[in-house]
């Protein structure tokens, strides 16, 4: 039942040319607890490619709440391939907030399993793809518990030939009675 008043923060910086970063973040928010976690990511620009392949595992307990916020502003030589997963128990709330503004190529597709009755998930994402960038973002949710709800809400901006791709998947299992889901994606292309 602990509520953490001040957000926990982490910052990942890849500081060497031709290097890879493979961090693993594990967060367990136990029954009745509340946490906001903020993750920042960046790297200086090098003349060779770099790789970020992070892994995030999140567990949201009964009647707990977790907001996981990510701001990614990688340099244009970065390949950013993340794996982010969450499991939410009864009455739990998972909130994803994602800002993707950098990298040469990104694939960001967090997945949430709404396992417990009355659990819910919300994903809010903003993506900006400029010259030479290919950013593939979105979210996936699997409803397995009764009376679960999810909302995926994204906005993207593409400029100077940048490519922004949105994908989402919503699966409602046979035992997820009275569950509901909504997906909203809006894109703005600033090229002629």
Predicted segments with their positions:
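Conserved beta-strand/loop scaffold segments within soluble protein domains that form the structured core
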Residues: 1-192
């Amino acid at each position: 039942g602990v509520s953490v008043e001040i957000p926990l923060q982490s910052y990942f910086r890849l500081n060497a040319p031709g290097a890879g970063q493979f961090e693993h973040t594990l967060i367990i928010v136990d029954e009745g607890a509340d946490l906001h976690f903020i993750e920042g990511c960046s790297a200086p620009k090098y003349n060779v490619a770099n790789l970020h392949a992070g892994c995030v595992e999140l567990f949201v307990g009964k009647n707990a709440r977790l907001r996981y916020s990510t701001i990614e502003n990688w340099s244009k030589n970065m390949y950013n391939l993340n794996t982010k997963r969450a499991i939410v128990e009864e009455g739990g709330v998972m909130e994803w907030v994602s800002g993707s503004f950098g990298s040469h190529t990104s694939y960001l597709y967090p997945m949430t399993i709404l396992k417990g009755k009355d659990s819910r998930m919300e994903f809010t994402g903003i993506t900006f793809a400029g010259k030479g960038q290919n950013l593939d973002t979105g979210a996936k949710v699997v409803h397995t518990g009764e009376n679960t709800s999810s909302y995926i809400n994204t906005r993207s901006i593409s400029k100077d030939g940048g490519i922004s791709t949105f994908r989402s998947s919503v699966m409602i299992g046979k035992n997820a009675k009275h569950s509901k889901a909504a997906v909203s994606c809006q894109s703005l292309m600033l090229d002629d």
